[in-house]
Amino acid sequence: MATTRLKTLYQETIVPKLTQQFQYTNVHQVPKLVKITVNRGLGEAAQNAKSLEASLTEIATITGQKPVVTRAKKAIAGFKIRQGMPVGIMVTLRGERMYAFFDRLISLSLPRIRDFRGISPKSFDGRGNYTLGVREQLIFPEIEYDSIDQIRGLDISIITTAKNDEEGRALLKEFGMPFRDQ
């Protein structure tokens, strides 16, 4: 299988640039992408089997991988949830699929967001990982407007080997992540 554009960019351009910027002594110290998780909480749709199926097909279409149904660990009466009920779906992307999805995300999907001025640079977790919330699935070119029954959002978490937010931000910026200026 041919390597993706971003993986080649990482190996040929980003590694030397970050090595020089942070004075790494070894190429293995340079932060890299580990995985991308795409998650959707079902909320009220947990009781509706048709809504669950629609979410499963949408996430599978967006990521190119079959999602896993996450289930409630314990019952919560306030949320009308019993143990074992479906509460969300998620996909973990690694390797070539991860790079292909990330490429589509930053070059095609994010610019399609209405009134897009860049993404917030404040959504790092302190350890170099970034989480992005998407309000509607229509920003992905794989989803057709006529095929959806309801607008639903999803969360995208980008997990890196960076030690802190500064390294993580530098890595994602080099990949072409459109951060908003502060």
Swiss-Prot record:
<dbReference type="InterPro" id="IPR031310">
    <property type="entry name" value="Ribosomal_uL5_N"/>
</dbReference>
<dbReference type="GO" id="GO:0019843">
    <property type="term" value="F:rRNA binding"/>
</dbReference>
<keyword id="KW-0820">tRNA-binding</keyword>
<comment type="similarity">
    <text>Belongs to the universal ribosomal protein uL5 family.</text>
</comment>
<comment type="subunit">
    <text>Part of the 50S ribosomal subunit; part of the 5S rRNA/L5/L18/L25 subcomplex. Contacts the 5S rRNA and the P site tRNA. Forms a bridge to the 30S subunit in the 70S ribosome.</text>
</comment>
<dbReference type="InterPro" id="IPR002132">
    <property type="entry name" value="Ribosomal_uL5"/>
</dbReference>
<dbReference type="GO" id="GO:0005840">
    <property type="term" value="C:ribosome"/>
</dbReference>
<comment type="function">
    <text>This is one of the proteins that bind and probably mediate the attachment of the 5S RNA into the large ribosomal subunit, where it forms part of the central protuberance. In the 70S ribosome it contacts protein S13 of the 30S subunit (bridge B1b), connecting the 2 subunits; this bridge is implicated in subunit movement. Contacts the P site tRNA; the 5S rRNA and some of its associated proteins might help stabilize positioning of ribosome-bound tRNAs.</text>
</comment>
<dbReference type="GO" id="GO:0003735">
    <property type="term" value="F:structural constituent of ribosome"/>
</dbReference>
<dbReference type="InterPro" id="IPR022803">
    <property type="entry name" value="Ribosomal_uL5_dom_sf"/>
</dbReference>
<keyword id="KW-0689">Ribosomal protein</keyword>
<dbReference type="InterPro" id="IPR020929">
    <property type="entry name" value="Ribosomal_uL5_CS"/>
</dbReference>
<protein>
    <recommendedName>
        <fullName>Large ribosomal subunit protein uL5</fullName>
    </recommendedName>
</protein>
<keyword id="KW-0687">Ribonucleoprotein</keyword>
<dbReference type="GO" id="GO:1990904">
    <property type="term" value="C:ribonucleoprotein complex"/>
</dbReference>
<keyword id="KW-0694">RNA-binding</keyword>
<dbReference type="Pfam" id="PF00281">
    <property type="entry name" value="Ribosomal_L5"/>
</dbReference>
<dbReference type="InterPro" id="IPR031309">
    <property type="entry name" value="Ribosomal_uL5_C"/>
</dbReference>
<dbReference type="GO" id="GO:0006412">
    <property type="term" value="P:translation"/>
</dbReference>
<dbReference type="InterPro" id="IPR020930">
    <property type="entry name" value="Ribosomal_uL5_bac-type"/>
</dbReference>
<dbReference type="Pfam" id="PF00673">
    <property type="entry name" value="Ribosomal_L5_C"/>
</dbReference>
<keyword id="KW-0699">rRNA-binding</keyword>
<dbReference type="GO" id="GO:0000049">
    <property type="term" value="F:tRNA binding"/>
</dbReference>
